[in-house]
Amino acid sequence: IKEIYEQKKTHHLVLKILKSLCQRISDYKESQLREASAYDAMLQAATLGITEYIDAMRKANPDLLWAIDKNKRGIFSHAILNRRRDVFRLLNRVNGRKEIIKCRADAFGNNLLHLAAFIGPSSDLDRRSGAALQLQRELQWFK
């Protein structure tokens, strides 16, 4: 029970820090966001599946949704490549720009649908038992 209490306490502190961070970056321009590594943090959060962070930051500063890496892959590209379903579902909350995000190609000419067709990370596949279940999960991502 003490361990759960410590986790909740830590989570509460992290939420306070996130709220403070959101207040601070809400008025930042693109150059300030780059200098603060906010774009990199968004991409890392997408890779790790930290939905709460991405959602709070995008509400504070919608420009953060346009974060891209050196391969011109954005938040939702990273979510798909790492099979982070909850992050990908945030796309439904994006007003008016869904189609632009969905159709945007990376440096290799791949859009979100192409990335969904790639095989997921081996660590993700190893956690599932049986080839049939792995294939089923990959087909669900492609759909």
Regions picked out by a protein language model, each given a short descriptive name:
Residues 1-143:
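Acidic, Ser/Thr- and Pro/Gly-rich low-complexity regulatory segments
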